Swiss-Prot record:
InterPro entries in the cross-refs: Puta_zinc/iron-chelating_dom (IPR005358), UCP006173 (IPR008228)
UniProt lineage: Bacteria, Pseudomonadati, Pseudomonadota, Alphaproteobacteria, Hyphomicrobiales
Pfam families in UniProt: CxxCxxCC
Assigned protein family: Belongs to the UPF0260 family.
The protein's name in its UniProt record: UPF0260 protein Rleg2_0895
NCBIfam families the record matches: PRK05170.1-5 (NF003501), PRK05170.2-5 (NF003507)
Length: 160
């Protein structure tokens, strides 16, 4: 019997629905509004969250019905994950797709869904809901932390 966890022995395409869903660490970073520069294609994260993101749990408040409220919500699928450039570098789907392991704080590793928040990886406490701003001011909310979360712990592990 193979003792490797499913994310180390299966491709995204081979995963069951339950395995697929469990790859989400609950960070909420994919639910942040992003700005794409037309000329360069560069993508910038903002601290402005989707109106459905629960800022405390970092989960969608209406996951099953999200398209009723946010028609352009991007559903991550086994087919599109390889092509989505804006997935944060710590995203479980991205990591597994790239053949990398999950981080120590991922709930599948830690056994606790709170470690993603305790480690400072998630959007918890860092966002403003899109309903609370003038969308024309979105560029005033550009942040880099979704691209740098986790770096400090990684550096500490490398030094150890």
């Amino acid at each position: 019997m193979n003792d490797l966890p499913f994310w180390k022995r299966k491709t995204l395409a081979e995963m069951t629905v339950a395995e697929w869903e469990s790859l989400c660490d609950g960070c909420g970073l994919c639910c942040l509004n992003k700005i794409e520069e037309w000329d360069s294609g560069d993508i910038y994260f903002t601290s402005v969250s989707c109106k459905l993101l629960d800022g405390e749990s970092c989960r969608c408040s209406s996951y099953e019905n999200r398209w009723d409220f946010v028609p352009d919500c991007v559903q991550l699928t086994k087919e599109n994950v390889p092509d989505i450039a804006w997935l944060p570098p710590t995203c479980g789907y991205r990591l597994v797709n790239e053949g990398r392991d999950l981080y120590w704080w991922h709930p599948l590793i830690s056994g606790d869904p709170e470690t993603v928040h305790a480690a400072g990886i998630s959007a918890r406490g860092r966002t403003i809901n899109e309903n609370e701003i003038d969308i024309d001011d979105l560029e005033d909310y550009v942040v880099d932390w979704p691209l740098t979360v986790g770096e400090e712990k990684d550096e500490e592990e490398e030094e150890a």
